[in-house]
Amino acid sequence: MSSYSESPKLPVREIPGDYGFPIISAIKDRYDYFYNQGEDAWFHGKAEKYKSTVVKINMAPGPFTSNDYKLVAFLDATSFVYMFDNTLIDKTDTLGGTFKPGKEYYGGYRPVAFVDTKDPNHAALKGYILSSFAKRHNLFIPLFRNSLSDHLFNDLEKQVSEQGKSDFNALLPNMTFGFIFRLLCDQTNPSDTVLGAQGPEHLRKWLFPQLIPSLSARKLPSFIEDLLFHNFLIPFGFVKSDYQKLVDAFSKSAVSMLDEAEKLGIKREEAVHNMLFLVGINMFAGLNAFFPHLIRFVGEAGPNLHTRLANEIRTAIKEEGGAITLSAINKMSLVKSVVYETLRLRPPVPLQYGKAKKDFMVQSHDASYKINKGQFLVGYNPMASRDPKIFANPDEFVPDRFMGDGEKMLKHVLWSNGRETENPAPENKQCAGKDLVQLLGRLILVEFFMRYDTFTVEITPLFRAPNVAIKTLTKATS
């Protein structure tokens, strides 16, 4: 990505905002962010209070998990994309925000997601991941379809029939983990390894202490949850045995991928720890955040959209002789648009962090602001992707927003740590699984509407991803 000009074209303003009293103000902001207001309202409130989309903030979790929580936030589409400029933004150890888990969580290595592009190791590791996906692209559709059939739809139908509804979120981990494991591990079934049936549980236990400082589980009284999870980092020892089982399983089963790493000059041990980070954070956590939003939006849209989707999907597949192929999926413009719209409204990773590599000027829609070298920065993707100066009805789910001439707006879809019109490469920080995530989103819709004409949902809001219950399933009649 080319560097942005450092010559401001708009009036220069001081960055508004106030960090307040040391520690006390940051803790108040943390309670507002997690409990009193919620993430979305908190960021919108800062922009409204200071009449600016570039503002100073105390970023949660703050004290005492981090000493560096005084950030500048980019809250519109114009300022947010500066976070993608690798000549300006250093991403070293900023993936999780203002705190970072110890290296022991990753076998003593730093996964590529924590490495800046200036590090020579970045291109080698990112290139390895991209080439691994490319070599397995023919497996994406058949393996995912099998996982959907074996670990999602059969259980959905059974639970709806017997219990009156099915917890969609609860069924996802086994389905997504099984797909990921078979994809990366030479089609080995995870239950045939040391993991048995507990693979998703070991993975969730390992992920929990890495993610919980920046989340709210909403299962405990706020003051207890805050005390336990937002004031210090959980030691690795609590999840060491879970992680070791994952390491053992992938080391023994992902033979081809690890052989490929060695041919590229990457140590087998380093490759397996990078693979586990890819599996856990990028794929497992990302997909389990994305799919509930997708099914929620489609479910709430109702029968009219369902009929349109079913007609498009079934027609495209019929034209392919009844086969669900990549060629057929690529013809489904409404399906594509629905997936893009979901990723626009609810990006799986809502926050992008980094530190300024040098002094530069950042522009919002109406002003320029000086960013000093070393300043810690955060971009809030849901506000950037719902910028009212870019999108009409920005907070509404518009299924066909990106159809026809609407495709021109794809450059403003920013969920992948890059523009939708750009591609991941060894020299950038864009999500290596960008195309795979979109394909799986389309494929789950294809499978839904090949089986069912319509369905209804019941939604329970959570901190970020909703809990989705499937209430009814009407089987396909044509």
From Swiss-Prot:
Heme binds at C431. It catalyses: (9S)-hydroperoxy-(10E,12Z)-octadecadienoate = colneleate + H2O. It comes from Capsicum annuum (Capsicum pepper). Keywords: Heme, Iron, Lyase, Metal-binding. InterPro entries: Cyt_P450, Cyt_P450_E_grp-IV, Cyt_P450_sf. Belongs to the cytochrome P450 family. 9-divinyl ether synthase subfamily. It comes from the Eukaryota. Pfam families: p450 (PF00067). It is an enzyme of class 4 (lyase). Involved in the biosynthesis of the anti-fungal toxins colneleic acid and colnelenic acid. GO terms for molecular function: colneleate synthase activity; heme binding; iron ion binding; monooxygenase activity; oxidoreductase activity, acting on paired donors, with incorporation or reduction of molecular oxygen. Its EC number is 4.2.1.121. This is 9-divinyl ether synthase.
